[in-house]
């Protein structure tokens, strides 16, 4: 399994100078609100995907009165440790380096550093629009299906061109010129998503049974256009409305994966704590499927685990994570709220300083 052997963070949020050696399995960061616990997890997340899970404004990540931040790790890849780091300045320039070389794409970091992130807002999986749920499925395909990323990139280009043509109200021939490419890649992407959902659902049911046995949720995959028509037929049917609205209404960019309980949306029935457990079940199943398909376990980032969960549920989460055999970074206020296994390291975070205990 991949794991982070060392972590250095400079001038990222309130973390002025952090240099720690995480445990290869459990790591628990505790401290008061605002101490910097979540920022530790956020820095790892940023290094993997090039963005924050807390803000869309990257300039807020740079510590006050400084002009740049640096995040650096050594990552064990199964055979050796490789260096991976990023520097970003207040002008927006950033440099990602992997194994001593400048990386041309952030997908290279994401591939080497697979993360399952469970933040305080993860329950939004059920509440937010379809985009977050598509991203959940696409994360899996990015890591397990070699052809996915190129298909996804081509689809985005075709969709962007078609939408621009619709918005500009170009002649019909120039609009429909993009349909063939959009349909080819759209149908392939749909098939990949459908296959991954079929493999994912039994694992999700298995995980959910551990947390909420009385709530047999059912997952429903919607491909993004009517089951009555092919994608090409749907584009032709929708063309007049697409022209009026200036964008493509049907296609895999509209896909969704919804959860229901007794034919009702899960979010209408479950409490916030229960929604949090559903999200945990989703991400643990995601990690299990990745391991089944590739032999690689993701690193888990679990922010504020104790919140909204009683002691029994907290213990259940820890026991399940322990079975996943992955490196885990967990945050919370009180270390006594978590029953950590022997193979773990406890870190105290105070005013942006981090110390192993």
UniProtKB/Swiss-Prot annotation:
Its main location: cytoplasm. GO terms for cellular component: cytoplasm. GO terms for molecular function: ATP binding; single-stranded DNA binding. It is found in: Cytoplasm. It comes from the Bacteria. Pfam families: SMC_N. The keyword Nucleotide-binding applies. One of its GO terms (biological process) is DNA synthesis involved in DNA repair. InterPro entries: DNA-binding_RecF, DNA-binding_RecF_CS, P-loop_NTPase, RecF/RecN/SMC_N, RecF_2. Belongs to the RecF family. The RecF protein is involved in DNA metabolism; it is required for DNA replication and normal SOS inducibility. RecF binds preferentially to single-stranded, linear DNA. It also seems to bind ATP. HAMAP family: RecF (MF_00365). This is DNA replication and repair protein RecF. It comes from Coxiella burnetii (strain CbuK_Q154).
């Amino acid at each position: 399994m991949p794991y982070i052997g060392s972590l250095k963070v400079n001038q990222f949020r309130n973390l002025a100078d952090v240099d720690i050696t995480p445990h290869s399995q459990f790591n628990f960061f505790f401290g008061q609100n605002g101490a910097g616990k979540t920022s530790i997890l956020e820095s790892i997340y940023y290094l993997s995907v090039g963005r924050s899970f807390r803000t869309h404004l990257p300039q807020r990540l740079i510590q006050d009165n400084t002009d740049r931040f640096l995040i650096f790790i050594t990552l064990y890849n199964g055979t050796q440790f490789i260096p991976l780091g990023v520097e970003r300045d207040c002008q927006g320039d950033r440099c990602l380096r992997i194994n001593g070389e400048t990386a041309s794409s952030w997908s290279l970091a994401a591939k080497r550093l697979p993360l399952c992130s469970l933040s305080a807002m993860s329950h939004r999986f059920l509440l937010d629009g379809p985009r977050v749920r598509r991203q959940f499925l696409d994360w899996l395909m990015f890591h397990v299906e070699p052809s996915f990323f190129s298909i996804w990139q081509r689809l985005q280009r075709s969709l962007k061109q078609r939408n621009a043509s619709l918005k500009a109200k170009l002649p019909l021939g120039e609009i429909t010129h993009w349909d063939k490419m959009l349909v080819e890649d759209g149908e392939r992407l749909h098939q990949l998503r459908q296959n991954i959902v079929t493999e994912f659902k039994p694992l999700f049911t298995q995980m959910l049974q551990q947390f909420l046995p009385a709530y047999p949720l059912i997952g429903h995959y919607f491909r993004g256009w009517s089951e009555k028509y092919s994608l090409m037929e749907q584009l032709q049917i929708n063309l007049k409305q697409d022209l009026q609205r200036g964008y493509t209404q049907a296609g895999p960019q509209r896909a969704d994966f919804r959860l229901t309980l007794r034919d009702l949306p899960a979010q209408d029935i479950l409490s916030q704590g229960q929604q949090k457990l559903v999200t945990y079940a989703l991400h643990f199943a995601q990690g299990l499927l990745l391991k089944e398909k590739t032999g690689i376990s993701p690193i888990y980032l679990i922010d504020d685990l104790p919140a909204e969960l009683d002691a029994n549920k907290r213990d259940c989460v820890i026991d399940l994570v322990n079975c996943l055999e992955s490196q885990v970074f967990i945050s919370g206020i009180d270390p006594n709220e978590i029953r950590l296994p022997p193979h773990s390291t406890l870190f105290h975070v105070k005013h942006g300083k981090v110390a192993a205990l």
